[in-house]
Amino acid sequence: MSNWDTKFLKKGYTFDDVLLIPAESHVLPNEVDLKTKLADNLTLNIPIITAAMDTVTGSKMAIAIARAGGLGVIHKNMSITEQAEEVRKVKRSENGVIIDPFFLTPEHKVSEAEELMQRYRISGVPIVETLANRKLVGIITNRDMRFISNYNAPISEHMTSEHLVTAAVGTDLETAERILHEHRIEKLPLVDNSGRLSGLITIKDIEKVIEFPHAAKDEFGRLLVAAAVGVTSDTFERAEALFEAGADAIVIDTAHGHSAGVLRKIAEIRAHFPNRTLIAGNIATAEGARALYDAGVDVVKVGIGPGSICTTRVVAGVGVPQVTAIYDAAAVAREYGKTIIADGGIKYSGDIVKALAAGGNAVMLGSMFAGTDEAPGETEIYQGRKFKTYRGMGSIAAMKKGSSDRYFQGSVNEANKLVPEGIEGRVAYKGAASDIVFQMLGGIRSGMGYVGAGDIQELHENAQFVEMSGAGLIESHPHDVQITNEAPNYSVH
């Protein structure tokens, strides 16, 4: 039988329990480097990841956060085909060079070209002699189709085939931009020595490179994206489809990552995908992190029950206050030379700084993005104000939609037999995700400047915390005043 001292191991701290101590600094906020390397093929320019929740991250959110320099994790409350399509939308939204452009043949109907353009929001399609030889013979664009009345006509009757402007494989963006401007065209097909279509550069993608200089991209200039899978019978099929669609990582998403069945499944996934990036969680202890790394995970997700819509801690009585959980898991991550993501409990940009200072390499956010334009949640008006729906993946509605396996209830068929660990609610409408990111980054840079940390590694090494009393927390917030105009980075919860 354990004695009192071993039963109650230690005190746990969360964000409202601590503050970072300001220190001598030679770092200005605008000099701070926020780049973070999570895995060999996964380097972000900002340490922000949007949660794999069905009211937070679809393709629109993933595109927005990747353009800002972060990473979106596409939720799994949809069919395998639908989720893979969401990944493709992100990967095709922006390219340095499109290495696998869509193409049709002269025999295809104009209607097929139109359907392809509308589906993927592109303005033109290269035309090849045959699907087998891929020899470029023309291109059809929106301009070619503008006055067509017979959409059953073959593309050969309307495509541009003479005086095609092309470039060789390996042409850089600067040269491509010059060619596009010189010929007043929007698309530049890349061909090999045999005239075979091997890539495509568009003026739109070049403009996006200029507009979003800090975007998080893969080696081909495409936006980074991850996607969630569960521990179910379709795990391998789903993971295969997601990687095939271009996912840079998969997130094995469960409520309790330190579970024998989960660890066995992760080891099988690692054996099946030996060279892919695997993120898994959630855990809240050093032992949990160690078990996941031993199973083959690259990045561990930390947090059991800290989220605003999560009820695990009160329904199950289980969890570890988030700052302590991050700190303990980070110590193990350093042993393995790997990384962690702090998932949940963050309300303000200052909490992000605390999460990083405690050892996090990035943070995962749900509620802070749920109210944005890009979030999939429905918009509603309540008492004259605009809100968006937000629900935990452990809520009844989300579990019925497909997330019940996350809470080890995948075999439950009746809604009234589900035991939820989350709630459904609403959050205030916030506008564009880019505006939220701007304010977040300003707060993170400011915090790192206060403690003299030029990058996240220095923050790990040099930051020190002070425990805060309840009175200290009251003092930390605006007090003894009635707020008349809310600041863009602060609201009363």
From Swiss-Prot:
Residues annotated as catalytic: 310, 406
Ranges of residues in domain CBS: 97-155, 159-219
Positions with a binding annotation for K(+): 305, 307, 310, 475-477
Keywords: CBS domain, GMP biosynthesis, Metal-binding, NAD, Oxidoreductase, Potassium, Purine biosynthesis, Repeat
GO terms, molecular function: IMP dehydrogenase activity; metal ion binding; nucleotide binding
Binding site for NAD(+): 253, 303-305
Reaction(s) catalysed (UniProt annotation): IMP + NAD(+) + H2O = XMP + NADH + H(+)
Activity regulation description: Mycophenolic acid (MPA) is a non-competitive inhibitor that prevents formation of the closed enzyme conformation by binding to the same site as the amobile flap. In contrast, mizoribine monophosphate (MZP) is a competitive inhibitor that induces the closed conformation. MPA is a potent inhibitor of mammalian IMPDHs but a poor inhibitor of the bacterial enzymes. MZP is a more potent inhibitor of bacterial IMPDH.
Cofactor requirements of the protein: K(+)
SUPFAM superfamilies tied to this protein: CBS-domain pair (SSF54631), Inosine monophosphate dehydrogenase (IMPDH) (SSF51412)
UniProt-listed Enzyme Commission number(s): 1.1.1.205
Cysteines paired by S-S bonds: none
Family indicated by similarity: Belongs to the IMPDH/GMPR family.
Subunit structure of this chain's protein: Homotetramer.
Alphabetized HAMAP family for the sequence: IMPDH (MF_01964)
Designated name of the protein: Inosine-5'-monophosphate dehydrogenase
